[in-house]
């Protein structure tokens, strides 16, 4: 399975990105995958700093910057970054997207454990491994922080919401991850939630 690791980045998470890139370097040594980072910081300057981190950890990712309006909310900015990743998966001939957020440190065998679950059955379209919410101990976090998504889903569903086009579509971008999952399930696909397979997962906040 040809996998693209893709994640939005922003300068506000500079506190964790070098540790994350070191983690990526070790993981991709064990399970080869390409890396795409989509920056939505204010201006393109932050990319230079990220490239220095990549050089230090012998990574050669593709990094693009989206120049988005300052008034655009955080959730929409992230959604537009994910749409850029979706387009890269489709144009690059990848079989799956590994959505792995930069504030999560995972074991180097994590991806190799998720891939067989996605390949096991044709009806499994998404495999998401729960982690813990930083603010509330022992509360599961159901976002796309560590999630493997099959290409088939990305061919069908965009991350750009066309409000009013579907009566079940949310009115804001905040629950857009839940909406993506809902579309997959509504169309007969299977969304698999996994707990305990990948351990430990560190959700960084500083």
Regions found by a protein language model. Name each.
Residues 7-22, 41, 73:
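Active-site beta-to-alpha loop of glycosyltransferases that engages the nucleotide-sugar donor
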Residues 13, 38-50, 69-70, 104:
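A conserved acidic beta->alpha catalytic loop
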Residues 19-32:
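Short, acidic, metal-binding catalytic loop of nucleotide-sugar glycosyltransferases
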Residues 104-168:
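Conserved catalytic core of nucleotide-sugar-dependent glycosyltransferases
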Residues 2-7, 24, 34-38:
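Hydrophobic targeting segments
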């Amino acid at each position: 399975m040809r996998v693209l690791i893709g994640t939005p980045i922003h300068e506000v998470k500079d506190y964790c990105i070098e540790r994350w890139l070191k983690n990526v370097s070790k993981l991709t040594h064990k399970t080869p995958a390409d890396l795409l980072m989509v920056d939505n910081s204010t201006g393109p300057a932050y990319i230079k700093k990220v490239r220095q981190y990549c050089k230090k950890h012998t990574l050669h990712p593709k990094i693009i910057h989206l120049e988005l309006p300052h008034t655009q909310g955080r959730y929409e900015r992230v959604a537009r970054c994910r749409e850029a990743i979706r387009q890269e998966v489709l144009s690059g001939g990848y079989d799956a997207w590994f959505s792995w957020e930069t504030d999560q440190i995972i074991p180097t065998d994590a991806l190799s454990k998720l891939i067989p679950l996605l390949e096991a059955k044709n009806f499994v379209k998404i495999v998401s491994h729960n982690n813990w919410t930083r603010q509330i101990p022992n509360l599961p976090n159901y976002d796309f922080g560590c999630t493997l998504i099959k290409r088939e889903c990305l061919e069908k569903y965009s991350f750009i919401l066309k409000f009013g086009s579907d009566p079940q579509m949310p009115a804001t971008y905040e629950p857009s991850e839940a909406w993506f999952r809902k579309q997959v399930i509504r169309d007969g696909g299977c969304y698999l939630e996994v707990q305990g397979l990948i351990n430990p997962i560190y959700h960084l906040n500083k």
